[in-house]
């Protein structure tokens, strides 16, 4: 059955299905929208007590519900300049060293940092022998993505690609999953060197947005696009630890890359572990 589920993803019209779901999720359908939201909350056991607006009737579209804001103080950010915090509510898929330019996708499946970063060899060199972590956001999770540390945006890269599901089953069976799916790569300069925060698209992920640029996708393209940002001035994008940097409509995966000898992951971190945005993720070395 698992092979059938994975095999079907090669045949379904991924982009067409995603466009359709995106349109439906952004539609203002009144009581029907409310009914769908109520079903989703029950189906995925979504905790609405921590949402700023807990009544499903508040949301005019499903997307508004999906990127719901939390109550003030619901995600306190762990203080300390040396502490890097989790960027999202998620589940740890994989983490560890980047060896020979390769990241672990799942047992028996690796992929290259260079491919993940849109084929940029020079950029990939900045993370040679560094560290990575892959965080999977499930449907029930809070789907805003935040900064794990203070950072100044240097570059944003849109990389076109497929839209396979990114759940654990697919990660274990589709080669180069995260390097073949559509993604938005954000490169930040930090006190401990470069950091990449990559937002990976997936089936029915209708939109990836950034706080400084709005919606990056859709529309979906066939070309890698790059935007460079200044370190100073009116056009500089400087974000503090815990600040929102992007969001998914509907959810997917966040991948972080860190430079060599820059960080050490929290000793309690392990694969399959749920994460809470703002809690300890790593320590600066």
From Swiss-Prot:
PTM comment text? Is synthesized initially as an inactive proenzyme. Formation of the active enzyme involves a self-maturation process in which the active site pyruvoyl group is generated from an internal serine residue via an autocatalytic post-translational modification. Two non-identical subunits are generated from the proenzyme in this reaction, and the pyruvate is formed at the N-terminus of the alpha chain, which is derived from the carboxyl end of the proenzyme.
Q: Which residues carry this modification: Pyruvic acid (Ser)?
A: 252
Q: Which cofactor does it need?
A: pyruvate
Domain of life, per lineage: Bacteria
Where are the active-site residues found? 89 (charge relay system), 146 (charge relay system), 252 (charge relay system), 252 (schiff-base intermediate with substrate)
Q: How does it assemble?
A: Heterodimer of a large membrane-associated beta subunit and a small pyruvoyl-containing alpha subunit.
What name goes with this protein?
A: Phosphatidylserine decarboxylase proenzyme
According to its UniProt entry, this protein's organism is: Vibrio parahaemolyticus serotype O3:K6 (strain RIMD 2210633)
What are the leading ranks of the lineage? Bacteria, Pseudomonadati, Pseudomonadota, Gammaproteobacteria, Vibrionales
């Amino acid at each position: 059955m698992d092979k059938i589920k994975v095999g079907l993803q090669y045949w379904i019209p991924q982009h067409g299905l995603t466009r359709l779901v995106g349109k439906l999720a952004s539609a203002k359908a009144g009581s029907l929208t409310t009914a769908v939201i109520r079903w989703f909350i029950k189906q995925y056991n979504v905790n609405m007590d921590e949402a700023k607006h807990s009544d499903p009737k508040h949301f005019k579209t499903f997307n508004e519900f999906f990127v719901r804001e939390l109550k003030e103080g619901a995600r306190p950010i762990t203080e300390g300049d040396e502490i890097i915090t989790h960027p999202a509510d998620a589940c740890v898929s994989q983490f560890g060293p980047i060896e020979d330019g390769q990241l672990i996708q799942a047992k028996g499946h690796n992929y290259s940092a260079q491919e993940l970063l849109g084929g940029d060899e020079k950029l990939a060199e900045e993370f040679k022998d560094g560290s990575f972590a892959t965080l999977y956001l499930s449907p029930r999770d809070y789907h805003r993505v935040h900064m794990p540390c203070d950072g100044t945006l240097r570059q944003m890269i849109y990389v076109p690609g497929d839209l396979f599901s990114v759940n654990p089953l697919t990660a274990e069976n589709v080669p180069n999953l995260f390097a073949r799916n559509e993604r938005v790569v954000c490169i930040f300069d930090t006190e401990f060197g470069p950091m990449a925060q990559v937002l990976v698209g997936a089936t029915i992920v209708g939109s990836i947005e950034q706080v400084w640029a709005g919606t990056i996708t859709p529309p979906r393209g066939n070309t890698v696009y790059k935007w460079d940002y200044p370190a100073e001035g009116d056009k500089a994008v400087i974000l503090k630890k815990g600040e929102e940097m992007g969001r998914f409509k509907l959810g997917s995966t966040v991948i972080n890359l860190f430079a060599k000898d820059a960080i050490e992951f929290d000793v309690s971190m392990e694969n399959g572990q749920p994460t809470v945005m703002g809690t300890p993720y790593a320590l600066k070395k």
